[in-house]
Amino acid sequence: MAKVSLEKDKIKFLLVEGVHQKALESLRAAGYTNIEFHKGALDDEQLKESIRDAHFIGLRSRTHLTEDVINAAEKLVAIGCFCIGTNQVDLDAAAKRGIPVFNAPFSNTRSVAELVIGELLLLLRGVPEANAKAHRGVWNKLAAGSFEARGKKLGIIGYGHIGTQLGILAESLGMYVYFYDIENKLPLGNATQVQHLSDLLNMSDVVSLHVPENPSTKNMMGAKEISLMKPGSLLINASRGTVVDIPALCDALASKHLAGAAIDVFPTEPATNSDPFTSPLCEFDNVLLTPHIGGSTQEAQENIGLEVAGKLIKYSDNGSTLSAVNFPEVSLPLHGGRRLMHIHENRPGVLTALNKIFAEQGVNIAAQYLQTSAQMGYVVIDIEADEDVAEKALQAMKAIPGTIRARLLY
């Protein structure tokens, strides 16, 4: 392979929030040794200072990459979210700068599904309330309000990777599984898709939420929806904190319309483990509250570390953007010559202008890869030419109207 445009030991990776050591091991094994690692999140000023000369940043859910922070990152090439969600990153601002954002949407699927199963079993048996009372010295041995999971109906809202895993695990306990999704999905096992959310809420003994955070899911479980739930049923939310209207949930618990709940995510969460946590749900003994630990298992964090680090390495090594959330997706083979990358506004004439540059210089294009999204185009061009010719072509590419970013990869 031709010499890379920037030596790997000069490419800086900024990793915050204690991403798993497997990520560091993967980066070092690939030749990336210039790594700045922080166990916790950085405040805005520290973040801006550290990211200023970083080429890559890896973060989890507490660090917020706003447009202001992204614009302070003068050399930033890509962002890796070592978690499922990417709502902590201004995706549009990153796209405008030609910066792809990668995440690990499936690596903690099993961990979240197992947590929900555990919460479901505890709630059905009334363990949270019995445990709280026992801690206060109250012995309350009763069968009333305590149930087996077998034969109960589980309603899953959002039948994606976590929802399907949950359904499989619940069926193994003898539960009847129903799900609601905005798209028609192929059921796994004996699960049944329900066409209307209200029907799912009416029939389910336990309702578990597994939806993304977007305008359509904000407070999707409000007073109206909770009132449609079966009296004495249970609500579990291990998806996003904005999905459940917390005051409405408190009202349903206080009136005993719901027998209990398990909440792992909240509308606002402490920035660090040393910050206090407050919620009106704290007053209810029959509610399980956990600090956003759905994906916090050693296995999940290791898988996430390997997956996201691998995506950053591939993008740095050969320009592949497969599974980027804000960027045209291209999976690329290695090439022995020179590789140039051009990120541009999706408008007519750009590809023609690019090809004209090489035609005028008498340079043959060995391979060309193009992928577009609604707003952006991403072209990777492999050529057989010396470094001076490639550098001259790069400068001409940068001058094309509509160019967001262009660089010589190697």
UniProtKB/Swiss-Prot annotation:
The keyword NAD applies. Displays feedback inhibition by L-serine. Inhibited by glycine. GO terms for cellular component: cytosol. Pathway: Amino-acid biosynthesis; L-serine biosynthesis; L-serine from 3-phospho-D-glycerate: step 1/3. The keyword Iron-sulfur does not apply. The active site is at residues 240, 269, 292. NAD(+) binds at residues 161-162, 181, 238-240, 264, 292-295. It catalyses: (2R)-3-phosphoglycerate + NAD(+) = 3-phosphooxypyruvate + NADH + H(+); (R)-2-hydroxyglutarate + NAD(+) = 2-oxoglutarate + NADH + H(+). InterPro entries: ACT-like_dom_sf, ACT_dom, AHAS_small-like_ACT, D-isomer_2-hydroxyacid_DH, D-isomer_2_OHA_DH_cat_dom, D-isomer_DH_CS, D-isomer_DH_CS1, D-isomer_DH_NAD-bd. It comes from the Bacteria. Optimum pH is 8.5 for the reductase activities and 9.0 for the dehydrogenase activities. Its EC number is 1.1.1.95, 1.1.1.399. It holds the Pfam family 2-Hacid_dh. Homotetramer. Belongs to the D-isomer specific 2-hydroxyacid dehydrogenase family. This is D-3-phosphoglycerate dehydrogenase. It comes from Escherichia coli (strain K12). The gene is serA.
